[in-house]
């Protein structure tokens, strides 16, 4: 088993989803400084949908990516800052902006069958000498052999780390083991391997341990689990478990608990928990950030969010198709004879 694991905090990026991207600069500063002091080595900061995510489709943030990054990066004493970039949302210009502000790690994210769209962004990030990560989302929608092909593409473009990403919180530990082990065996020994998951089936910690045992050395988590759906793997819990297992993370067991309890929980707009809708995300294999969109559509069209999420899963909807949630709700409402106000 790998004895040194890099933990990557998601509180200030994935945690933007339940905050509707409206975190204040003061909240960002407070949490980032707490994470830094607790020894977290890598902290992601951006709009929930990555660089350039500010839009009608995904939601407008309280501040620009430049403001968030420009506020947090100068305050870090040991932690590095990462940014997420989804080709088609974020551009090479966004990438250059992030690099100019001092972003250390760029994570270029695509659907798990579409690694080919990442070539331009990964190639540019490597030219800029950034820590360059290929991030394969919705990994339950591709089998181990398929993920291997996609991972090799990203590695070939220049990514020095590949992530298997359970965006829906759908995978079970044996499925994580199968995918991670296959990708690990296929990559160059020097290429790092990461795992990101959601806690929709309460599998966050178990799946992260399975990933580590199968060869992953970077693991995503969030303080108090703040993230889309039922949240990400709770960082403070994962740190405690890894400490008991004798795995070095460099994160202080007690300080990270205090960050979660004293800084992150108070800024939650609602409890991050496995309610029936978040559970349905995991059960039906639906992209985590769809949750609030489905709840809004329930209020507008009278279709229970759970029913809508199941239908989205049946249709195989993926990240980036947020605009189709409303369309699906409208179709379902009409099919059920519900009155829809235009």
UniProtKB/Swiss-Prot annotation:
Residues in Pyruvate carboxyltransferase domain copies? 5-257
What highest taxon heads this organism's lineage?
Answer: Bacteria
Site positions per UniProt: Transition state stabilizer: 13
Annotated residues that bind Mn(2+) are located at 14, 196, 198
The family database entries (Pfam families) matched by this protein are listed as:
DmpG_comm, HMGL-like
Active-site positions, per UniProt? 17
Sorted alphabetically, the keyword list is: Aromatic hydrocarbons catabolism, Lyase, Manganese, Metal-binding
- Write out the GO biological process terms: catabolic process; L-leucine biosynthetic process
The residues listed in the UniProt record as binding substrate, with positions renumbered to this chain, are: 13-14, 167, 196, 287
EC number(s) given by UniProt: 4.1.3.39
What InterPro entries does the database record attribute to this sequence? 2-IPM_HCS-like (IPR050073), 4OH_2_O-val_aldolase (IPR017629), Aldolase_TIM (IPR013785), DmpG_comm (IPR012425), DRE_TIM_HOA (IPR035685), PYR_CT (IPR000891)
Q: Which PANTHER family match?
A: 2-ISOPROPYLMALATE SYNTHASE 1, CHLOROPLASTIC-RELATED, HOMOCITRATE SYNTHASE-RELATED
Q: Which family does it belong to?
A: Belongs to the 4-hydroxy-2-oxovalerate aldolase family.
The entry's protein name is 4-hydroxy-2-oxovalerate aldolase
